[in-house]
Amino acid sequence: MSERYSHIIQALGQSTFDKIQTCKILVVGAGGIGCELLKNLVLTGFKNIDIIDLDTIDISNLNRQFLFRKQHIGMSKAKIAKESVMKYNEQVNITAHHGDVKSSEFGSEFFKQFDLVMNALDNISARRHVNRLCLSVDVPMIESGTAGYLGQVSVIRKGKTECFECQPIAVPKQFAVCTIRTNPSAPIHCIVWAKMLFGKLFGPKDDDGGGDSSSLTDLDNNIIHGTEELGNIKRDEQLLIEKEKGFKRWVFHKIFHTDIETLIHMPDLWKDKQPPTSLKLDEILSSKEVSQAEEEGDQLIFKLPDQKQWTFKENVEVFLDCLEKLKQQFDQSNSKPMTWDKDDELALSFVCSASNIRSKIFGIPMKSRFDVKSMAGNIIPAIATTNAVIGGLIVMEAIKVVDGRFDQCLSTYLYQLPSGKRLLMPTQLEPQNPKCFVCNRSFIICRLNTEKTTISQFIDHVLKKSLAVNEPILTVGNDIIYEGGDQDLSKEEIEQRSKIEKKTLATHRLTNDTSLVVEDYNQDFQITITIQHTTDFDEDTKKLKKQQQKEKDQKEGKTTTIEKEEDDKFFEIIGKTSQTTTTTTTTTTTTESDNNSNNNKNNNNNNDVEEDDGFMFIEDQPSSTTTSSATPSISKKRKEIDTNESEDLDSSKKLKSNLQD
């Protein structure tokens, strides 16, 4: 044993190594970061390790989760990770748990036994849960994550640093479908549109991506959705000519010329902005265009092929080629509907090229294939080397914690490109946020209509979705009015609870200025909520506010945009760390999540991100973007990295991330 770890003892000293050997570690998550972390822990000398992971191994994991092989597909990640990592040292004591970390068996009593918890998770819900449990039993935790080429490691300790929930959690932003179809203003709008086009051309008749996709001939309709009343639009005779020349020319002319001309003839859309420009295919194909390599020169040295942005002409050529090949596949399968898949190279190239062409039409910056993949699937591509770097940084911080050198612990951020001469940026740990409702157990206020909001709505949207309470127990005074969880309830009690859920808050004495105590025993969590009755979120009130906003915008010459989440909002929380907004590829009629299929099959509660990378938040001003590198700032507001709004990183500014395994 001493010979195996002689280099570790020489570097750290015998005393520190003895602490490493005797401490007990919990690793939550055995995916991309988890595999690297487990290997590093064993090679460093950690002997007593527990692993928790609910997921099973999918073929898509094998390119980066190196502890798994093809023969392991369908098996427990935690158990196979244990078997594989023990080949490095058979004398380590590893216990694998194939289960959900949020289940009652992994409560506060379970967490008490560990000296340190390491998160290698891929979703916010589980992160919040582990954060609360570690705070409740005063066990230090190391939080980590990656997002493509970006990564972060940070140490959390009760009473000494900010917790995971001290900073705002990004919430998805939704786009109105009319914005996507008629008035795009950002790359994500064009990417969602391109996915909708794929569904319309090749998807099932009721494809979520494209709405009405009853047949390919639907594209021959010369009036786009929402403009049927514009009778002054002339029929495009060239469309018929292009149709005679072939399918791909017809589609191109229809969506990039005919439909754009229709939009141009809607002057109200373009009062305060430049109208789109319709395209003519022959003019584009005959043009000469400077390549990106000639424009950027040495800057391309740091870019991989998928990161290089195609020229406009290249996008057109790729679009036509993909369209032809997809049509052939569609015909050869007897018109069997296709589903867009981020890992299908042809389908991805189609969406990338189509979205970039549309971006060019509307004067929006085009994106690389790498960025489009990240945004189109609302995922962050997994990069094995990033996971490896973060896995190493976790162990470096773990050694400090175990050795009692907590004052030396740091948050370290991994950048995509050198900042100065550094890819790694260490910073001091942030102190507690005094307004955090988790680690400071503060009170919060919830404003809603108590006469219309049901107990079920309050639990699902306010407690579970917004406050991440899994199994709430609601108490008013000395009376328990609701108890979550099914473990100890009889069938009759469950039926009775179902009846309670359908009743409004007011019928249970939850009226204006009522003090409600919410507990979750599994999280060892408690919070007091002051209920305030308001009609601000009633439909009539919201309609009035919209009308007033519209009139105000018209006077100021602005375009009124009402986001769907504002339409659906029925409550407001005051006193909780405010939320930032991130964009997801969703519309008022569709949800474009396209989660990793393995994540869906195995119920690991991923939040629309590819399994290894997860959520990465930056300390920056709130932004409505999607995922990639972004310019960090010293301000303490976290946002989800937008792979679509890629910007340069500045060494004087600080990244903050929470990602996934």
From Swiss-Prot:
Subcellular locations according to the entry: Nucleus
Compositionally biased residues, Basic and acidic residues: 548-563
Enzyme Commission code(s) on record: 2.3.2.-
GO cellular-component term (any): SUMO activating enzyme complex
Keyword Transferase among UniProt keywords: yes
Active site: C178 (glycyl thioester intermediate)
GO function term, MF aspect, one: metal ion binding
Disulfide bonds: none
One GO term of the biological process aspect: protein sumoylation
Keywords assigned: ATP-binding, Metal-binding, Nucleotide-binding, Nucleus, Transferase, Ubl conjugation pathway, Zinc
Record's compositionally biased regions (Low complexity): 577-607, 623-634
Pfam families xref list: ThiF, UAE_UbL, UBA_E1_SCCH
Region described as Disordered: 545-661
Quaternary structure (record): Heterodimer of sae1 and sae2. The complex binds sumo via sae2.
Known role: The dimeric enzyme acts as an E1 ligase for sumo. It mediates ATP-dependent activation of sumo and formation of a thioester with a conserved cysteine residue on sae2.
Protein name: SUMO-activating enzyme subunit 2
Protein source organism: Dictyostelium discoideum (Social amoeba)
Taxon lineage: Eukaryota, Amoebozoa, Evosea, Eumycetozoa, Dictyostelia
Primary gene name: uba2
